[in-house]
Structures are given as structure tokens and as C-alpha cells.
């Protein structure tokens, strides 16, 4: 049954396998009039791109092509399709995988579900994290539209393996973690993370981590009770990322250890005269609705399943127990690149709900709106460019 | 925009407010031929019912009425509607709430979204946990259908405030937590939980907790990549429960602290000759698909927001800061009753995906299937009855 | 699989069988702040009510109860549920039907699909036209919301059996067919229709007919290419009415006999300075989008299947050919009451698309909007009341 | 808001504009294991291809590429994507259109909805019938899957302008209309149609027509009451085709002129001992469900809007009335190629409902099923090949 679409008013449908000719995404529901260019999408993809230090060695240029929905540089209201060709594909690295499902991977469940004879094992096929590039590509459009409500999203790697950020961090620092090749929001943290990564690489092992995403200026009242609450849709979107095994927002699991008098927040009049909450303990969501405070959520990534260390598995040809050393080209910690994917998923959910709640016009932008979005986007890109180069 | 429906092939739509004439649910997608009675639904509701020791004092009989979709004791394929009248309603307890939004509650976000003038504040209106009775009612049908695949769901309160179960626990013990008024799976734990509850009641405070849900005999391959993965739909469903602020499955957040060589599981040949995983570290879901191992997931409940202790809020009449002591009748730990709601949500997601994957016939049950389900259900009820009475 | 919901932003889910305790509808997606009363719904239902001259003798009071989603006379944003109890039920009239499926009815297909043992034959069960009362009830809310765009819908019986209106008719005349017990838009036509009906009643037979629906002031640009075009969603909605076997808009089937130079319309500057079409040959829809001209569509109703004349069928007990004379209480021409149902379906589709295109705020109405709607609605009711009484 | 997807279990999402780099379709919900090749898709496309006698002069090779979802010649369960590059594009023919919206076309409504500045006027942009090639491509997969239930679909041009088939026609003759370049099911009809077309071409005019689609061996019980009835979903699908302005099934509009005793069918025991209907007056659908008889439906195509004859329009630069002679390369009767598109839409709806009703396994085909489908498909292609060549 279909499962490759997400969103009700801003709806993405992704397609493509790791070692097929291309991956891509159809974005349906983009209002007409938005300026959008290949460069806008490339820009967002640049923060996810493999082939950098500390991540997988696969050298994909990730060059997006917009093949529908845009005319003369602006969206037309028709479905917007982006394709990204797969260039740097070495399927031969996966020959062993064909017979020996990799522990921690989707290999065996896919075989169980779809049949061994129908399994595209090359590079993980459809279950490969390569698919997430489509999501990040689509998120460029989401982020541009969110300029209309001044919503900006920052994300960083809050913990990597045993190392966790345990001091205060500003939205600015989180946002600027784009500067860091390991998405650390503090310099000292970056060093510690890099050390862990190097050590794991040497050992042929990997680390898990926690990505934290913050969104500023989230429109008030996003979320539709009782099942399409903002927290529900965010949880679904984040759990749809490969390797994500947990989600929490606000106090999250810590709240389960607390008393009501600790976990409840105080309702106050803010300096701007508006009602709000003193400490934002709820992470910006109360009653399932955005409440005007910063959105704060985290998701747990398990360690990269592909490791060089030998692991026990079964040889499907002989049905005998065997071992495998996964050789492909893999991230020592998927959580690092996962940060930008988590950020993308939050953008996709927020823009969907901003449309659902009427904050963004569903059919077309006015000329003013289109222009303002473009100006804000230019400033955003300018601001982020040094970060892009630093990585 | 609509948000009150969940599921694609087994689709529930709930309605009703805490202090309206009734709450209810339409279940669309139930195959014809299933035996279903008011008693079946009442049975499941009995484990959630307020008015017991350690939970809210509201005395609702929770008497469900099936008003459509069943003829001569069997489903007809038409939408099945269950209504539950609200009887024990004391709206006067909420007069103060009308002007003083309760910290930690949906009050203020609902006002922000829908307008103060349209806010049904009585008993929390639509945001009340009362709505979850509709879900539990619907879950009786889900659980009966899941008898076809021998899928059984157990759930317990894994931690309450600072007290956490830190020893091995069997599926049987978890299942039998229905015996416990605080949903503890061990006797010593029950005592500790009860103590905490009593103390909180005295203090006019509340506690958070973690519910763990285990499902045995989950059909293999449930979940639809890449967005309707089983983990995604479970996360969405569980986060849609009021007061749930976190979700994890398998190793969950702990995996984020681990190395790949620790977090990966071993693929082995089981005693029955089938492929499987040695330790079920993945909690029954790999690649987003159920893998034949037990489903293991947890969700974090924040402490009950309604506490008698005075809390800071704002009086909407004067726009001045004020305090409120929430007096209604509330659970000292929503997590306790939350256990049965979490269990219900898991049942609803599993049956939806079992239908999506073809494990349950979409249109009608054969006579054999209907009879087998009924027999298994009778055994299940007999088994659980002593638990019901012990509470 | 679920099939009892319609609409994406204004979503109705109906439930209930002809001889069950009640029928009803959940309307999800109604913005908060709309004034709505039981009387508003009763008013719309009055034009569909059976128990009048020329239609079925079943005496249903059709008294709607709003059981959720409204507080203090205004919608809250929560799902709005309306129930209508079934009172005048005589199931004994259906004893013969149990074994002899009625020609032209859903009896045998329902038995084939859901199983004989699960078939609620009483009054046609779920397939009864009784279900359409839920749709008309929901359409009251749709029509009120459409007051915001001044959209008004008129409908009449364009033909009954061999008699067809073949002269010009104004929107006003069509709208005022509510005065007529047979939904005729001209006095001479009314007489002819009544004669036909009387004759059919005497013969124990029935007639088919064509309902025409016109909507004035339809917002421009409704419809979402390429599958949710306005014409597509209208066709689906109208074909979902029992006994409807055909749909056309604008020139409809006549266009298939024409040349392009005849069927094309002229694009002109209207007196108000706006672009438009000279003759509205397209019936208000071009490219699948509403184009600002009046919406004009028709649907064909087959004759009432329930007739007293003996018809050939098979006795399911003996598997031998047999005959049946259907005795229940039935309309001699379902098309008559079908007019109000067709009108309701058009309202439901238009309001859904008006929401999708941003003409109606998705979350809540402003105080001004709520007031203006109410004023216009009052005028509409006042205008229609004499029509109600005349029937 | 998204509108480019159709179907619940077999879900197509199309993208692409007439003069963009490519058009295409994602098919989500295809079970794994189906053999599928580029040739299969090309085969179906061949019956729709422009560039033949009597249809548009645009010479598109319509060469489909499968870029995802297939591995080693079989579907994998991942979304299957087909792209078709646009090669023979002459946008210069549309320069006049840019300022003079064409009567009968989507031009002006698209401008009204999405804004003049966002309008891709080249070749009709998204509203071009070119998009229907994506649907026909997807229908190849649908038709293959329907081999499992032996469902075969035939379609022919029942009338063209004033000429209508008024004698009996067999399913075989209808099916073999693929032989005819004008989709006529009788030789004498073919000649009359060709004459009409030639005359229209000379005059610079066009004709409307009616396509009739018949499906044999439709599984029993397809359709989900009360809104996703088979007739409703068919109506929606057919009305989504550009230029379709009417739909009917069975007796259709003729039933509206009849008495119940004429329109009702007789329920009988068929020669095979099964229950059925004597005359199939209902066209295979009763109560909204397929009833085991042949599906019979028709849709009305208006005449091609693009004609060389001068027509009145408005010049958008001057806002003055003007005339246009549409020069591009167009079919003299869209209904001719419309036959294959109507056939495709019926296949798409039937396969969706066959999956919804459990006739086709939702996740994967067994080896036997895959093989049987392939064998039947080969026979079907062999049978149709001479027809392909004759055109």
C-alpha cells in the first residue's frame, strides 16, 4: 500500500533507490509565484552532502534538476518535481550483502516483506539513507515559504555517543552549527565529537547521537486535534528518518521523572504584552498546538549499522550462521548528517501545518509576498554561506 | 482542517467533548462478519475507567452503545459507531478555568487558535483526556481482529516519577499488570508506585511516568516505507495521546549513546528454524518494518497538569498575573490510565497495518475466521477477568 | 476499506442504517465561530423530508441533534456531530426482502460483498436513501459557510420521465422550485409532474428524472488539477447518491454532438469590466476550474427501484426464480427528493474547495465574518420559508 | 492544495508540463514481484500516441523510462516511476496564446487562479492533454495486475459528432476497435468517422464524441459505500480527463426517462448456476458495487477546443476584444485518443478497488501469480499487436 507521501497541503512523494538512475521528489501543493531556483535547492543539499570529512566517502555531486512546476523561475502551482541523478555508484561493494543480510539494516525485513527475489540490495535500495536527499531538496521550498512567517529552523548534534552538551546554548549557536563539520554548536564540543569519530573510524565502529531541532517564530496554533496534533505529525516525520529510534519535545522523557509542580510552566505576560510561558518547558507545543514559544525537539539516532567490525549474520544460500564486515562507504555516525535531515523534516511538517492553518496562501503568493520571501531568503543564504564554506 | 481521524484501512474518527452530551467514535473499515457486543467494548473500557482508586474521582459508567454497523451481533461492513454518554459532569468546577488558563494545559493554546469566544472550557472540552475513552472503545474491535494473527498486546507502567523498573520482566508479567491498580508488573513496584501516588495526593501534586507496550506475534513486514513505516505511525499515534511527550522503541534513546557494535543485533537461525535476531535490540522494528520479534516501545507521560498546588497564570479578564489551584477531579498520574490508552493506540496502528499488509481480509471474515476470533477472544477475556476484578 | 468520508478540508463521515437506532454525520474541518443551531439544520432537512405528498409515506420527524462541536451556539473547531434518530421504522415490511433480493436494489450486491449472514436487510440497511439525510444535515453548515462568498445554490427537477423542461428558466425560478412539492420550476411543469406521479402511483410503478443544480457566485478558481478538478469532485459526489446513474455539466452530452466552433464560448469583457464568457456554455467550469460563471450541472436519477408491480427475482432459500412486489413505503420518483440531495452534495463540494482555495478561513471566522454569515443566512431562511410552507 | 494523485491503494501521482523537459508518473502501491518492462508500457502508450493519421501532428516518440521501483525486471514494492521526455516541442506556436486566451481552453481559468505571471502557456502547460500520457503509462501496470482476475477492458468511440453506433456490438468488436485509427468498432462506422474528421480538418473545425468503455470479468463487490462507490470513483476518474463533460453507466441518462418496471432488471440464475441479472441494465454496478456483470460506461468528450477557425477572445495586453485562430498541432477530435485515456482511467480505478477489496495481494505476488500474469499479458499483447500495426 502507498507509503511514500507525507503531508496534506504541502505533500511530498519521494522515489528512487540508492543505485538506480536517479532519486527524486514531487512536491504537490506549492502555491504559485514562489521564486525557486536550482541553486536554492543545492544550497540546502550542501549541508547534507556526503563526500565531506567525517561522513561517507561516496562522492555525490547531488545536483538537483527541477523538471516540472517552475516556469521563468517561479512556481506555477503545478506539482514541482526535483530529480537528483545517482552518479557515484559502486554496486560491486554490495555483492556480499546479497547473501548476508547486514545486522541493524533493513535488508532482512525487506526480504521478509517483499521477497528475496524482488530485493534491490544494491546500496540498500529503497531503504538507503540516500532517499533523504529528496527530503532535504523539498525542504528548501518549505523553508522559503516559511520565510513568510519569519520561521527559522536551527539544528545541532546535541550528543554523540557518550559526549553530550550540558551547558546553555543559544538559538544562534545552534543555527551556526552549520559551520561545524560535525554539527556541534560549541567549539569544545566539536573537538570532542571529532575525536570520537576518528576513534570509531579507526576501530571500524560507529556512534549514535541525538539531534536537536529548534524553530523560532513558529506561527501560533499549528496542529489539528486530536490526531494531527503538531507533536504527532512531527513524531511521525522524524521517526520516518532511517536510524531514528526516539523522539521527544520540550522536557521530553525527563518530564516522566518529574512532579506536576516542576513540569508545569507559568503563564505570564511577556515584555511585548502578549501572553506566553516563562520557561518554555513545553518546548513550544501545548495541547498538541504550537503556542508561540520556540519549538524544541530531539530525536535519537542509533549508531550507523554499517561497520567494518565483523558481525554475526546468516548466509542465505546455506542458511548457516556466518559473519560480515560491511565495507561500502558509510558515515561513522549517521546522526551528523541526520541533523540536516531532521531539520528538513521539521520544515516540511511546519510548512504543511502553516498552510493548514491559513498562514500561507494555498493557491498563490501575492507579488509582495513573493518578493519579501525572496529578500529574506537571500539574507538567509548570505548569512549561512560562510558556514557552508567552513565545513 | 480535519484532524480527528486516524488510520488508512482501519480508520477511527472520534468526536465529543468532556462535558457535552456524549463522546464517540466511528470505526470505518471493519470487515463484515466479526462478532462484536457491547460487552466486548465495555471489557476494554473497564481497564481505563476513571472512578477507581488512584485515578480521577469522576464516576463515569462508561457504558458504550453500538449504534451502527452491527446487526444480529455481527459487523456488517458498514461504519461501526460507538457512543458513550457523559453522565457525571460537574461543569461548575471549571468556572475559574474560564478566566484563568491552567498551566500545562491546552486551555491557552485552544484560546489562541480557535478564539476565546469559541472555547468550550468545561472539563477541558475537546482537549480532555475523556476523548481517549473513544479510542479504547475502538481498540476492542482492533484487538479482536488481531486475534486472527494471534497478536496480543501487553502494557505496564515502567516508571513512575523517580521509581523505575530495573529488572527483567516477562511478557506475562507485563500482560498481568492489568491486575494492578497502578499498572505495575511487579508486586514490589506496585507498592512503591502506590506510595508515590498517595504522597502526591497529599501534596496536591502529581507524577509523570513511562508506559511500555509490548506486542507479541506481530505479523512480519508491517509498515510501508518510507513515510508510513511502522515506527512512524506508532510514534504519531502515541504522541496523539494527551500528556505524551516522548516516544522510543527498542533501545530507544539509549542507542544514541552506543557504538554500532553494541547496538547492532545478531541475525541468527532460531530454534524453530526461522531467521531472527538474537537479542531483539531493535524492539521488533527494523527498516521501519516489523521483523517478527516482539514489538517493544515506550512513551513518556508528563505529570498530570491539574494539581491542587497554586500555580502562576494570568487572569484573562484583567490581563494580570494571578494564581490558580486546579480543583476538578484528576488523576494524580495520568500515566497510570495512560497505559491502557497507549495499549489501545498500538492495537489501532497494528490492525491498520495488518489490514494494509493483507493479514486480515479487508471486506469480510470467513465463517471460520469469525468463529476462531470469537473463541480466542473468549479465552482472552476469561484470562483477564480476574485482573479486572482485582483492581 | 473505509469509504464513508468525503472532502479534504470540510470532511463529512456518515454512519447509520435505515432501521438502526440513529443515523448521523461527523463534520470535521468546520472553522470555529460559526453560529449554528438545530433549527438551521432542521430547515435544510425540511426540504428533503419524507412523509409529504408525492414522496414516501415514512413519517420521520428528522429531528437533528447536535451532540458535539458547538458551544454556546457557535462552532468550536472540534468535530461537529449531528445525529437523527430513526423513529418510524417498520422492519416487518422487509421480511420478504430477506429472501428475495429486490431488482434494481443494492440487496444482492451487498449480499455478494459482505455475506448473506452479515446483511442488514431492514429498510435497505446502509444502502438506504435514508443515509442521505445525514448529507443534507451537513449541507446546512456548508451553505452557511458559503454565505461568506455569497454563493447560493438552486436546484430543480429538470425532467421527470418523458416530461422535460424545454424553455428558458431563470436562477430565481430554479431557486423557487422549493415552493413546489415536485421541485418543478414552472407551474405548468408542476402540473405535468404531478399527473405523472399520480399515474405511476396507481400503476404501482415509478419514474426517473433529471435534477439540475445551479450555483451562483461560485468563487473563481475552485478545483485542483489534475485529479481533484472541480468537475471530478462534483461527479464523484453526485454519483455517490443512490440511484444517480449519470452526470454532466454545461453542455454535457450534447457537446459530444457538436463542432468546436459551436461548443466553444466567446471570451468577452463583461459589463462590470471583468473577463468572462458570453454564453456560459462550459457551465462554469473550464480546465476543471470554476471560471466565475454560474455553475450548471445535471444528474440523472433512475426510477425508484421499489415498485409494487411484480418483478422477477430469485428466492435465496430455494435458489429458484420467483417474483416480488415491493411493499415498503417508497417515493414514486426518487428524483424529487433527490433534488435536495444533489443540491446538498454540490454545497459540500463547493465548501470543501472554497476552503482548499483559501476563500474561507480554515481555523476560525472573525467576529465580522460570523455576524455577516448569520445575517445573510437569516435573510436566506426568511426568503425560503414561504416555499417551505407551500409544499 | 495537492490534487495530482489518484487512488488509495494503487496511487498515481503525475507531474510535468507539455513543454517542460519531461512528464511522468509515480505509481505507489504496486505489489512486489510483477514483471514489468519498458516495452509493456510502450505497448499501451502506442494506442494513445499522437503523430498518427487523424490525430495531432505532434511527433512524440513517447519513449517511457522506468527510473525506480523495478529491479531485474520485477517490481520491488518501492514506488515505480516512469518518465517520458518531451522531444517534439515547438513553443513558438504558442506566442499568440500568451496574450489571447483560447476559448474552450484552460488558459483563462489558470490565469485567474494562479496569476498571469505564473502561467506556463507553452503548449497548455500543465492543463495540456499531454499529461494523460502519464496516466496511460501507469495503466499498463494496472492492466497487468488485473490479469490476475482476468479482467479485460475494451473501449471504442461510440459516437462522433452526429454519427452514432446504433446497432448491437460485441465485447470482441469493441476490444478490436484498437485496429481502427478512429477507434470505431464497425467498419462502416470507421468510414463515417473518417469522413467527418476529414471534413472538420478542411473546415478548421473539430467534433465531439462519446467513448464507451466495457470491462469484462470485473471482480464482484468492488466499491466502498457510501462515498467511494465504484460508480463515484469511476465518475471522478473519467471527469478528470481534459475535455470530458459527462459520465454515465448502464442505462445512464436514458434511465431518467423510464419507468421502474422498464429500468429494473430481472435477477436470475445464470447457466453457470450463479445469481445474476438478465439484461445488465445496471451496467455492472448496483448499490455502487460491481455485481459481476460487464461494466458498461460512457463519457462525453466535447469537441477539441483548438480550432483554426477564428474565434472571439480578449487580448490581455489591451483588454480589448480580439480574435484568435489556434494554429498548434491538434487532434480534430480529442475523443479519438480520449478512448484510450478513458480505458486507462477505468483500469486505474479497477485495480485500486481490486486491491481495496483484497483481490490482488497488497504486498507481493507469489511466484505463481507473477508467472500467470506474465503469460496472460503475453497473450494479450500478441492478440493486440495486429491492431497496433493496422492503425
UniProtKB/Swiss-Prot annotation, chains A, B, C, D:
Top-tier EC class: lyase
Single GO biological process annotation from the record: amino acid biosynthetic process
EC number: 4.2.3.5
Function: This reaction introduces a second double bond into the aromatic ring system.
InterPro entries xrefs: Chorismate_synth, Chorismate_synth_AroC_sf, Chorismate_synthase_CS
Entry keyword annotation includes Lyase: yes
Catalysed conversion reaction: 5-O-(1-carboxyvinyl)-3-phosphoshikimate = chorismate + phosphate
GO CC, one annotated term: cytosol
CDD domains: Chorismate_synthase
The organism of origin for this protein: Sulfolobus acidocaldarius (strain ATCC 33909 / DSM 639 / JCM 8929 / NBRC 15157 / NCIMB 11770)
Keywords, alphabetical: Amino-acid biosynthesis, Aromatic amino acid biosynthesis, FAD, Flavoprotein, FMN, Lyase, NADP
GO molecular function: chorismate synthase activity; FMN binding
The name this protein goes by in its record: Chorismate synthase
Pathway: Metabolic intermediate biosynthesis; chorismate biosynthesis; chorismate from D-erythrose 4-phosphate and phosphoenolpyruvate: step 7/7
Required co-factors: FMNH2
Record: residues binding FMN: 126-128, 287, 302-306, 329
Family membership: Belongs to the chorismate synthase family.
Domain of life (superkingdom): Archaea
Cofactor note (record): Reduced FMN (FMNH(2)).
Positions of NADP(+) binding: 48
This protein's record includes keyword Flavoprotein: yes
Pfam family, one: Chorismate_synt
Amino acid at each position: 500500500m502507498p507509503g511514500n507521501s507525507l503531508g496534506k497541503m504541502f505533500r511530498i512523494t519521494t522515489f528512487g533507490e540508492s543505485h538506480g538512475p536517479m532519486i527524486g521528489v514531487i512536491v504537490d501543493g506549492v502555491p504559485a509565484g514562489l521564486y525557486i531556483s536550482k541553486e536554492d535547492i543545492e544550497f540546502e543539499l550542501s549541508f547534507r552532502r556526503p563526500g565531506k570529512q567525517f561522513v561517507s566517502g561516496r562522492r555525490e555531486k547531488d545536483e538537483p534538476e527541477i523538471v516540472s512546476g517552475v516556469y521563468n523561475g517561479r512556481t506555477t502551482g503545478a506539482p514541482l518535481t526535483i530529480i537528483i541523478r545517482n552518479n557515484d555508484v559502486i554496486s560491486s561493494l554490495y555483492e556480499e550483502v546479497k547473501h548476508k543480510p547486514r545486522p541493524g539494516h533493513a535488508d532482512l525485513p525487506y526480504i521478509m516483506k517483499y521477497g528475496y527475489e524482488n530485493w534491490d540490495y544494491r546500496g540498500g535500495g529503497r531503504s538507503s539513507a540516500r532517499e533523504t536527499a529528496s527530503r532535504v531538496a523539498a525542504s528548501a521550498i518549505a523553508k522559503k515559504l516559511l520565510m513568510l512567517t519569519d520561521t527559522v529552523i536551527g539544528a545541532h548534534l546535541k550528543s554523540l555517543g557518550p559526549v553530550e552538551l550540558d551547558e546553555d546554548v543559544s538559538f544562534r549557536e545552534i543555527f551556526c552549527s552549520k559551520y561545524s563539520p560535525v554539527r556541534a554548536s560549541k567549539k569544545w564540543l566539536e573537538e570532542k565529537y571529532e575525536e570520537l569519530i576518528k576513534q570509531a573510524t579507526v576501530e571500524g565502529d560507529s556512534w549514535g547521537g541525538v539531534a536537536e531541532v529548534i524553530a523560532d517564530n513558529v506561527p501560533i496554533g499549528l496542529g489539528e486535534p486530536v490526531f494531527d496534533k503538531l507533536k504527532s505529525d512531527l513524531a511521525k516525520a522524524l521517526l520516518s528518518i532511517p536510524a531514528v529510534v526516539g523522539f521527544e519535545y520540550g522536557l521530553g522523557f525527563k518530564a516522566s521523572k518529574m512532579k506536576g509542580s516542576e513540569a508545569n510552566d507559568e503563564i505570564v505576560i511577556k515584555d511585548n504584552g502578549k501572553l506566553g510561558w516563562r520557561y518554555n518547558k513545553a518546548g513550544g507545543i501545548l495541547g498538541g498546538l504550537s503556542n508561540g514559544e520556540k519549538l524544541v525537539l530531539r530525536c535519537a539516532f542509533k549508531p550507523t549499522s554499517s561497520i567494518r567490525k565483523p558481525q554475526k549474520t546468516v548466509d542465505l544460500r546455506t542458511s548457516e550462521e556466518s559473519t560480515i564486515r560491511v565495507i561500502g562507504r558509510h558515515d561513522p555516525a549517521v546522526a551528523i548528517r541526520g541533523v540536516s535531515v531532521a531539520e528538513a523534516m521539521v520544515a516540511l511538517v511546519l510548512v504543511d501545518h502553516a498552510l493548514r492553518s491559513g498562514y500561507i496562501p494555498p493557491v498563490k503568493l501575492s507579488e509582495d509576498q513573493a518578493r519579501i520571501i525572496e529578500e529574506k531568503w537571500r539574507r538567509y543564504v548570505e548569512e549561512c554561506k560562510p558556514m557552508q564554506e567552513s565545513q
